[in-house]
């Protein structure tokens, strides 16, 4: 009996654990502090800084089953998903890693043992082929002489992509970053399937399938293409779980493995589909995996960056559901079956199931409102098409008006053998994309990519000032030996009391100084294991090796500490008041305010906001001790400690507890006791994305300032109403009631005046071929009264055509009324359109009543004068 996908995943991890590897949990699909990546797309992403020598772990061997998404940027598989046997937006990458420990020999031997040993995967040795980089003689000899693979099944692959190192067997994560030669292992499905070995003209067939890529990490590729040797040669391997499952379960398509068969059946059930071979089922089964896990990792549908990629995938799935005949929202119903089939890999998703389902349901409902109209428009345009390409302007209109991502439009067109002018689409979107780029958080400044080989010791928990030594200086991202007065720079010290931005808490400000210089620190950031002090040298000069006194801005740090501790209390309070589905989606803690984004599907009610405030202030009054303990990550999680969204943790973590009320993993700075916070007040609650709410709050002196401001406003209002704060509500109700009464009386007077004006106007009507025509410009009449006047005049005049106009604040308001017995010859909409066009406006309406506006008041007399001739021509 073949292994299930879940069993294969576990067997891989167990094998490498038996070889001394640390089993490391999958990292988030949102890369941590890596502006070069849209999504985690390989197992090694979370170890990138380790390969670069910027981060250190307490293990030198690791193994993971990493969740990955490839649907945007360089690694974009979206258009092929559902149409091929092996393309996915979401997949799991099984991997083993060596950080300066073993290298080529052991990496190859481990792979061969796992694949061929009867105890593990037991694949037939004669079915396995390998490739090596053309010049990698060492790997070739290991495969031939130690493993024993015949020469005819070992293939050298050179630079086959038109540039040095551009090869299927020279791996690189992106345009920059860790890279090196690799050896790939292929499985031969047999001669009953078309295809040839790698490197042959028939290599794109499905007979020989790559199942494992073993990268020998030796270089760090720079932006200019140069290769810098990594500190220690390392190993990075990747084996797609879905691919190896297909091999071990004796099927040729990933969509035929147990995991996808189960999901496809679930899709068929919720959509009502009966043909299980329909490719739309495969598309949806794939897309629920990427969408659910992206949302669980904090990505929300939007029109920018990661959120837009998520929206594209959701809408593609919804459109395929529509093709299958789904009559109601269905996509969110697949989260439960997905959790079941993912086994232990779905535990994080299960904790957020309700939140993920709600986000998917809301997004599907929003798109469903425009999907049918958009598809109808696309059908119309395709029916009119004379060539084989849909113009970019139409594709953009579908995106802008109906929310159709261009790849969804391309999907529909491809089914009819029609191409989309994507260049034209991009041109139409250029201005919007420019604005999106300006608003985007992607693309870090030059400081973000600084490489610092040294480490800094943070001593800011216990000290706000201490002496340190300059170990590195950077100007414009480049290392320098010295800086002079007036220069902006990043200063790295061997030890520092300055807190570097992390976990939502901003970096410290302060001063680095001695008798000969003063450096104003405006921000503090992490660079690998180093802490960089960002600022400007105000006076003197500074060089590497100098001793400095580092002084943190104590008052600012104190305010930050209060806000950070209050954030923890508020997080716990939100979970008590709203439910345990609340999880942190982002935060900002500075010296003025705390901002907290969290998962919740609706605006908080006033009583809920008050309950959270009261609960936090109750903990402040309890004056609970705020304690920190260092412990193993797993022990901390077992204790119930909550982890912060988007943060990466070491195996040993800092656990912050506030009595029995709050326990979280946190490396930030905090008050000593909750009583230090003094007072907590929520100043705003709003939505930031589907299923995400944001609270801003203040503490201590900031909270007291808001209390005083509220009191001052109440006093001012009481003074204006000639009352006092004790009876202010009664006073306001009285004023509002009096205002309503006066507005009612005023409206009655306006209606009486309009009726009188209508009576006066009726005598000015002229006869045109048996129909009374009345055209008039009125002064001092509100635009909204024109309709009432037209109704009155139609009742008085019988068979009639009426055009009234008024000008207010330079804007023209027009209305046309036509009695129903005349609408077969004169339509109010056409008449008003003719007049509006002459005054720089447009409008429309029913055949018997239409309204319009305009901007050219000077042209109004001539426009009204043209009505008689236009009507006469229509009535002949």
Curated annotation (Swiss-Prot):
Compartments, record wording: Cytoplasm
MF (Gene Ontology): alanine-tRNA ligase activity; aminoacyl-tRNA deacylase activity; ATP binding; tRNA binding; zinc ion binding
A Pfam match: DHHA1
Principal cellular location given in the protein's record: cytoplasm
Gene3D superfamilies from the UniProt entry: 2.40.30.130, 3.10.310.40, 3.30.54.20, 6.10.250.550, Bira Bifunctional Protein, Domain 2, Threonyl-trna Synthetase, Chain A, domain 2
GO cellular component, one term: cytosol
Modified residue annotations for N6-acetyllysine: 74
Keyword Lyase: no
Enzyme class: ligase
Protein keywords: Acetylation, Aminoacyl-tRNA synthetase, ATP-binding, Cytoplasm, Ligase, Metal-binding, Nucleotide-binding, Protein biosynthesis, RNA-binding, tRNA-binding, Zinc
GO biological process: alanyl-tRNA aminoacylation; negative regulation of DNA-templated transcription
Cofactor note: Binds 1 zinc ion per subunit.
EC number: 6.1.1.7
Residues that bind Zn(2+): 564, 568, 666, 670
Cofactor(s) needed: Zn(2+)
CDD domains: AlaRS_core (cd00673)
NCBIfam families assigned to the protein according to its UniProt record, in alphabetical order: alaS (TIGR00344)
PANTHER family: ALANINE--TRNA LIGASE, CYTOPLASMIC, ALANYL-TRNA SYNTHETASE
Functional note: Catalyzes the attachment of alanine to tRNA(Ala) in a two-step reaction: alanine is first activated by ATP to form Ala-AMP and then transferred to the acceptor end of tRNA(Ala). Also edits incorrectly charged Ser-tRNA(Ala) and Gly-tRNA(Ala) via its editing domain.
Family to which this protein belongs: Belongs to the class-II aminoacyl-tRNA synthetase family.
Domain observations: Consists of three domains; the N-terminal catalytic domain, the editing domain and the C-terminal C-Ala domain. The editing domain removes incorrectly charged amino acids, while the C-Ala domain, along with tRNA(Ala), serves as a bridge to cooperatively bring together the editing and aminoacylation centers thus stimulating deacylation of misacylated tRNAs.
Subunit structure: Homotetramer.
Protein name in the entry: Alanine--tRNA ligase
Source organism (scientific name): Shigella boydii serotype 4 (strain Sb227)
């Amino acid at each position: 009996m073949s292994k299930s996908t879940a069993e294969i995943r576990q067997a891989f991890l167990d094998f490498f654990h038996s070889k001394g590897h640390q089993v490391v949990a999958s990292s988030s699909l949102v890369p941590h502090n890596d502006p070069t990546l849209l999504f985690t797309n390989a197992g090694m992403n979370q170890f990138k800084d380790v390969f670069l020598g910027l981060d250190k772990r307490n293990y030198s061997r690791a193994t993971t089953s990493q969740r990955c998404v490839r649907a945007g940027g360089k690694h974009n598989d979206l258009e092929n998903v559902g149409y091929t046997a092996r393309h996915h937006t979401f997949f799991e990458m099984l991997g083993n890693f060596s950080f300066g420990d073993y290298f080529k020999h052991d990496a190859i031997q481990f792979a061969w043992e796992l694949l061929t040993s009867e105890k593990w995967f037991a694949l037939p040795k004669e079915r396995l082929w390998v490739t090596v980089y053309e010049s990698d003689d060492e790997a070739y000899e290991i495969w031939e002489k130690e493993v024993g693979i015949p020469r005819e099944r070992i293939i050298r692959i050179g630079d086959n992509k038109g540039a040095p190192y551009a090869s299927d067997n020279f791996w690189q994560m992106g345009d920059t970053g860790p890279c090196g030669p690799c050896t790939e292992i292929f499985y031969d499905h047999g001669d009953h399937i078309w295809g040839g070995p790698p490197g042959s003209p028939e290599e794109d067939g499905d007979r020989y399938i790559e199942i494992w890529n073993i990268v020998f990490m030796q270089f760090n590729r720079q932006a200019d293409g140069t290769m810098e040797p990594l500190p220690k040669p390392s190993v990075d391997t990747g084996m797609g779980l879905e691919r190896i499952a297909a091999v071990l379960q004796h099927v040729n398509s990933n969509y035929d493995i147990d995991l996808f068969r189960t999901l496809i059946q679930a899709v068929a059930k919720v959509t009502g589909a009966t043909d299980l071979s329909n490719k739309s089922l495969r598309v949806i089964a794939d897309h629920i995996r990427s969408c659910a896990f992206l949302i669980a990792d904090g990505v929300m549908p939007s029109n920018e960056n990661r959120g837009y990629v998520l929206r594209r995938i959701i809408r593609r799935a919804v459109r395929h559901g529509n093709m299958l005949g789904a009559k109601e929202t269905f996509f969110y119903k697949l989260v439960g079956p997905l959790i079941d089939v993912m086994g232990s890999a779905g535990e994080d998703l299960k904790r957020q199931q309700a939140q993920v389902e709600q986000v998917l349901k809301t997004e599907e409902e929003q798109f469903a409102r425009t999907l049918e109209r958009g598809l109808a428009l696309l059908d119309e345009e395709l029916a009119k098409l004379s060539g084989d390409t849909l113009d970019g302007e139409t594709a953009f209109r579908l995106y802008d008006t109906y929310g159709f991502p261009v790849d969804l439009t391309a999907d529909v067109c491809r089914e009819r053998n029609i191409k989309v002018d994507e260049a034209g689409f991009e041109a139409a979107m250029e201005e919007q994309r420019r604005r999106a780029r300006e608003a985007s958080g992607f693309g870090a400044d030059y400081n973000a990519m600084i490489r610092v080989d040294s480490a800094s010791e943070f001593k800011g928990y216990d000290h706000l000032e201490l002496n340190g030594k300059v170990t590195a200086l950077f100007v414009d991202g480049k290392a320098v030996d010295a800086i002079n007065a007036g220069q902006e720079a990043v200063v790295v010290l061997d030890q520092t009391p300055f807190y570097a931005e992390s976990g939502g808490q901003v970096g410290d400000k302060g001063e680095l100084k001695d008798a000969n210089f003063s450096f104003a620190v405006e921000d503090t950031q992490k660079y690998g294991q180093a802490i960089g002090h960002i600022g400007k040298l105000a006076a003197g000069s500074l060089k590497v090796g100098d001793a400095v006194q580092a002084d943190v801005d104590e008052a600012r740090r104190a305010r930050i500490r209060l806000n950070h501790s209050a954030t923890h209390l508020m997080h716990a309070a939100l979970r008590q008041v709203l439910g345990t589905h609340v999880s942190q989606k982002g935060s900002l803690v500075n010296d003025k305010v705390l901002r907290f984004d969290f998962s919740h599907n609706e605006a908080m009610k006033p009583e809920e906001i008050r309950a959270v405030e009261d609960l936090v202030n109750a903990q402040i009054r309890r004056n609970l001790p705020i304690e920190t303990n260092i412990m193993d990550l797993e022990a901390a999680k077992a204790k119930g400690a909550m982890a912060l969204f988007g943060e990466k943790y070491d195996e040993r973590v800092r656990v912050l507890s506030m009595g029995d009320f709050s326990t979280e993993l946190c490396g930030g700075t905090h008050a000593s006791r909750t009583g230090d916070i003094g007072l907590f007040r929520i100043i705003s609650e709003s939505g930031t994305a589907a299923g995400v709410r944001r609270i801003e709050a203040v503490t201590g002196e900031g909270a007291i300032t808001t209390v005083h401001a509220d009191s001052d406003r109440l006093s001012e209002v009481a003074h204006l109403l000639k009352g006092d704060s004790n009876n202010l509500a009664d006073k306001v109700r009285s004023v509002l009631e009096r205002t309503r009464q006066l507005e009612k009386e005023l409206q009655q007077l306006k209606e009486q005046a309009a009726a009188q004006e209508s009576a006066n106007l009726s005598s000015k009507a002229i006869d045109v071929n048996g129909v009374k025509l009345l055209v008039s410009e009125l002064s001092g009449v509100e635009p909204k009264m024109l309709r009432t006047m037209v109704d009155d005049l139609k009742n008085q005049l019988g068979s009639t055509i009426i055009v009234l106009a008024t000008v207010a604040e330079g804007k023209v308001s027009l209305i046309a009324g036509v009695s129903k017995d005349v609408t077969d010859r004169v339509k109010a909409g056409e008449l008003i359109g003719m007049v509006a066009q002459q005054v720089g406006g447009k409008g429309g309406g029913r055949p018997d009543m239409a309204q319009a506006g305009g901007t050219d008041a000077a042209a109004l007399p001539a426009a009204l004068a043209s009505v008689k001739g236009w009507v006469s021509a229509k009535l002949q």
